[in-house]
């Protein structure tokens, strides 16, 4: 199993291109199941989770062509089966996103209960209740969710909690339903908007994406199209923190400041200089000048939970004490014990972490527990004194494209070690 070795202390400087967003790519790959025509997605990130989703589509019967320019063309004319098996779903929770498209187009689906990051229960009951309201019959047998339906019917669905994948699943299902579907308390994340843009390019009738109320008028068929996946705001935010904690100067290209308004505001409050351009963000920071800032994770447009662990690293070396309140997922402080091994002063009380800045972290052997936690440990290694050896880095490959190569290009002393 691969490990990553980081020797800290280098100041990172330079320009880095941002990859396509994993959290937009995965639902958009699933959306190709909705049509018999070919859909081409561009700016597809080369990630383990994307490979898993392509394998899942392939076993459903999709014909997949990949070009040399990060483009993927998917032809789902012939869906051979509607089962998402345990061996694929267990590795990636986003596999559940094929559920809505399969039920909408084929009238049935069998989905293994999902896996992915171990950051709380993240139940799919909100997805299932919505499908039931649209006329589907749902049963749970032998670890599989079995769903059967005729043509789905439009419904008024109010989410008890804001759910990104739940919004995406029901948004996709509703595009082929009979009648009008209203999703209230829907997720407003940029990735949901990007999915809606793809679906509308395929012929769907959608209004309100990016707000808390989305209205979908079902159509009988969707058609093929081409679509550019939006840039990854979480990768962007991660490299922004890398600039801050190393006292560096990094420009991220191919990304949009509007995707990260809450994160940019907090980094400015913490003492970073940030230049916003049309398709780029530049972050500069002086060593020893970072200030403590309180953070509460919230649904978009609030501070994203997927950048909580990275900002915690910044706060470990900032002046003063700060509070991080995690309101989205339970068990999302599993990186704290590893940061403490590196000398961080962090106390966890329920869903709140109190972070008191220290002059410097120290390198240590640490273990990644989930995707974003693994990124935080790399960031900690970059600003720590000495060597940090990070185990179980397969987590990071699920969401970051060639992270060690990109960091090395900016001046980091980092390398991947084989078994």
Swiss-Prot record:
Q: Which reaction does it catalyse?
A: phosphoenolpyruvate + UDP-N-acetyl-alpha-D-glucosamine = UDP-N-acetyl-3-O-(1-carboxyvinyl)-alpha-D-glucosamine + phosphate
Q: Which InterPro entries match?
A: Enolpyruvate_Tfrase_dom, Enolpyruvate_Tfrase_sf, MurA_subfamily, RNA3'P_cycl/enolpyr_Trfase_a/b, UDP_GlcNAc_COvinyl_MurA
- Residues annotated for UDP-N-acetyl-alpha-D-glucosamine binding in this entry: 93, 306, 328
Which pathway does the protein contribute to?
Cell wall biogenesis; peptidoglycan biosynthesis
> Can you name one GO molecular function term for this protein?
UDP-N-acetylglucosamine 1-carboxyvinyltransferase activity
Amino-acid positions noted as binding phosphoenolpyruvate in the UniProt annotation, renumbered to this chain: 22-23
Q: Which GO terms describe its biological process?
A: cell division; cell wall organization; peptidoglycan biosynthetic process; regulation of cell shape; UDP-N-acetylgalactosamine biosynthetic process
Q: What is its EC number?
A: 2.5.1.7
Q: Which cysteines are joined by disulfide bonds?
A: none
Subcellular locations according to the entry? Cytoplasm
Provide a GO CC annotation, any one. cytoplasm
CDD domains in the record, alphabetically? UdpNAET (cd01555)
Which domain of life does this protein belong to?
Bacteria
Q: Which family does it belong to?
A: Belongs to the EPSP synthase family. MurA subfamily.
Which HAMAP family would you find in this protein's record? MurA
The record ties this protein, via NCBIfam families, to:
murA, PRK09369.1
Which PANTHER family does this one have?
UDP-N-ACETYLGLUCOSAMINE 1-CARBOXYVINYLTRANSFERASE (PTHR43783:SF1)
Q: What does this protein do?
A: Cell wall formation. Adds enolpyruvyl to UDP-N-acetylglucosamine.
Q: What is this protein called?
A: UDP-N-acetylglucosamine 1-carboxyvinyltransferase
């Amino acid at each position: 199993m691969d490990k990553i070795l980081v020797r800290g202390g280098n100041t990172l400087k330079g320009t880095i291109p941002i990859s396509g967003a994993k959290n937009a790519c995965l639902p958009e790959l699933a959306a190709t199941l909705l049509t018999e025509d070919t859909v081409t997605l561009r700016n597809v990130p080369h990630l383990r989770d994307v490979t898993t989703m392509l394998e899942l589509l392939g076993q459903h019967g999709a014909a997949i062509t990949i070009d040399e320019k990060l483009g993927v063309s998917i032809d789902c004319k012939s869906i051979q089966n509607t089962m998402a098996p345990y061996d694929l779903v267990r590795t990636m929770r986003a596999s559940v996103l094929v559920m809505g498209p399969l039920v909408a187009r084929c009238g049935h689906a069998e989905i293994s209960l999902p896996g992915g990051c171990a950051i709380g229960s993240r139940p799919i009951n909100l997805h299932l209740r919505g499908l039931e309201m649209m006329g589907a019959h749902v049963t749970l047998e032998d670890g599989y969710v079995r769903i059967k339906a005729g043509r789905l019917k439009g419904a008024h669905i109010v989410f008890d909690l804001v759910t990104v994948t739940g919004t995406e699943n029901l948004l996709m299902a509703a595009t082929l339903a009979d009648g009008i579907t209203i999703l209230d308390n829907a997720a407003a994340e940029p990735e949901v908007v990007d999915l809606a843009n793809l679906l509308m390019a395929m012929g769907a009738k959608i209004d309100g994406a990016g707000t808390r109320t989305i209205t979908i008028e079902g159509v009988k068929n969707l058609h093929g199209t081409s679509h550019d996946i939006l840039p990854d705001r979480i990768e962007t935010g991660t490299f922004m923190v890398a600039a801050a904690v190393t006292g560096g100067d990094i420009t991220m290209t191919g990304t949009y400041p509007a995707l990260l308004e809450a994160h940019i505001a907090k980094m400015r409050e913490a003492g970073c200089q940030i230049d916003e351009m049309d398709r780029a963000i530049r972050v500069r920071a002086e060593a020893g000048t970072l200030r403590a800032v309180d953070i509460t994770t919230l649904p978009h447009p609030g501070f994203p939970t997927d950048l909580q662990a990275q900002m915690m690293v910044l706060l470990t070396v900032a002046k003063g004490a700060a509070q991080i309140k995690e309101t989205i997922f339970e068990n999302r402080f599993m990186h704290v014990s590893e940061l403490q091994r590196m000398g961080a002063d962090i106390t966890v009380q329920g869903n709140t972490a109190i972070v008191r800045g220290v002059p410097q972290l120290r390198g240590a052997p640490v273990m990644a527990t989930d995707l974003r936690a693994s990124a935080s440990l790399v960031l900690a290694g970059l600003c720590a004194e000495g060597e940090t050896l990070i185990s179980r880095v397969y987590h990071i490959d699920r969401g970051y494209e060639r992270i060690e190569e990109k960091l090395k290009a900016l001046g980091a002393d980092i390398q991947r070690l084989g078994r």
